[in-house]
Amino acid sequence: MPTLEWIGKSKVINHHQDVPFRVLERKYSFDENGQHNEDNGSENMIIRGDNLEALKALLPRYEGRVKCIYIDPPYNTGNEGEDLTRHDKWLCMMYPRLKLLQKLLADDGVIFISIDDTGYAKNVLRRERRKLLPPFLQK
């Protein structure tokens, strides 16, 4: 089976397991009347903080239960300037997040990843999971 290799992969391959657990604390809630300092009982959450730590914090409650995930990661198009290692850096950033998302995803769940046309050919991390669907294009 083909594998994707990049500089730094060995350092991040298990990084998602090393991310510390954080407890999600409800500090306020929202409803049609605005913000409240007390919990209104809603299961919806706005999480402020590092997204890697937030994903790890969701695992105890939602592991294997999420039916639909949509992410819109940075496109890695090089608009910030050409860097010969930018693809490696992007993969090192994305891999642990995708591994945690995979743990959250239900067996019959689906993940949508928003990427641009040039990123499509480069986004092969999702291919490590065998349940692939054809790309969904929106113009």
Regions found by a protein language model. Give the residues of each.
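Conserved Class I SAM-dependent methyltransferase catalytic core
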Residues: 87-139
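DnaQ-like (DEDDh/DEDDy) 3′-5′ exonuclease domain used for proofreading
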Residues: 1-70, 75-96
